[in-house]
Amino acid sequence: MDPIDNSSFEINYDHYGTMDPNIPADGIHLPKRQPGDVAALIIYSVVFLVGVPGNALVVWVTAFEARRAVNAIWFLNLAVADLLSCLALPVLFTTVLNHNYWYFDATACIVLPSLILLNMYASILLLATISADRFLLVFKPIWCQKVRGTGLAWMACGVAWVLALLLTIPSFVYREAYKDFYSEHTVCGINYGGGSFPKEKAVAILRLMVGFVLPLLTLNICYTFLLLRTWSRKATRSTKTLKVVMAVVICFFIFWLPYQVTGVMIAWLPPSSPTLKRVEKLNSLCVSLAYINCCVNPIIYVMAGQGFHGRLLRSLPSIIRNALSEDSVGRDSKTFTPSTTDTSTRKSQAV
């Protein structure tokens, strides 16, 4: 069998492997830890400690409401996506701590790092679905009163998850564990095969456009119309969920921006570029910043749930339940309340 051509292993923004000719082959002297890696370790720790219990609490609260409330279905699926990513953090933490060497099996190399991409696609597709729901509630209230229900919501979430899995396929297909030529340690990386540069560019473009640019443009247009309609009609009764969703959307784009920028730069810069080496040093930090998005949503829900005095008197589940509860659409619909939109008394909402 021909020896592996290590030149085909390109450093990419969705893995944590590295190939550094400055590392001694005997592996005795480990490379100096980069400041970005130190920051990433701190961020991973905080995200895990906040994200796992926070998202688990949201899942627990919304699971009881999901049978009758559309909003609960949206936020339940968001929390599940974030929780899955947070559960992979101990493995990623260990990898960064060990200078990006991989000490787990090949299956874990394929699955666990890919969870961050699955989270990205699932989150943005779910946010787009939630935003479309908000848009229709404001501009088509009568249609929503007749059609909107839990069955349709579950179907929309199912479509979002299937699309997210399909978009994550390149990471599953091209990711593998291999022996680093210089250090003889195992590295979890991406192998696009011969002539990998065009494939790497194509994957980077797909990730940028589907996971960031197109959703950003679409959601900006959507929320511009929603805000104009809300302000013009002073529909203050329907703004609670709108504010929560907008906060979640804004945080998504803020925390994923560094990840997307460095990803495109790594895909486009030639291997010999000095700039590429500098960008690669920020890779772990940018991934960790994207991970912050996995723990920030429960914090938003708590902040939006009640006033500060109310927070002191109410339990966290009650606060989250209040933040994610259904609200009326405002003046456009006279009786558009949870009882008329989400209960089983509406006509059948078959999936």
Curated annotation (Swiss-Prot):
GO terms for biological process, alphabetical: amyloid-beta clearance; astrocyte activation; cognition; defense response to Gram-positive bacterium; G protein-coupled receptor signaling pathway; microglial cell activation; mRNA transcription by RNA polymerase II; neutrophil chemotaxis
Q: Which residues carry this modification: Phosphoserine?
A: S315, S318, S325, S328, S333, S339
Sequence ranges on the Cytoplasmic membrane side: 65-69, 133-153, 228-243, 305-351
The region called Disordered is annotated at: 329-351
Locate the transmembrane regions by residue number. Answer: 38-64, 70-93, 111-132, 154-174, 202-227, 244-266, 284-304
Q: Name one GO cellular component term.
A: apical part of cell
All ranges on the Extracellular side of the membrane: 1-37, 94-110, 175-201, 267-283
Glycan-bearing residues: N6
Pfam families, per this entry? Answer: 7tm_1 (PF00001)
Q: Which InterPro entries match?
A: Anphylx_rcpt_C3a/C5a1-2, Formyl_rcpt-rel, GPCR_Rhodpsn, GPCR_Rhodpsn_7TM
Q: Which domain of life is it from?
A: Eukaryota
Q: What does this protein do?
A: Receptor for the chemotactic and inflammatory peptide anaphylatoxin C5a. The ligand interacts with at least two sites on the receptor: a high-affinity site on the extracellular N-terminus, and a second site in the transmembrane region which activates downstream signaling events. Receptor activation stimulates chemotaxis, granule enzyme release, intracellular calcium release and superoxide anion production.
Query: How the protein assembles, per its UniProt entry?
Result: Homodimer. May also form higher-order oligomers. Interacts (when phosphorylated) with ARRB1 and ARRB2; the interaction is associated with internalization of C5aR.
Cross-referenced PANTHER family: C5A ANAPHYLATOXIN CHEMOTACTIC RECEPTOR 1, CHEMOTACTIC RECEPTOR
Write down what this protein is called.
Answer: C5a anaphylatoxin chemotactic receptor 1
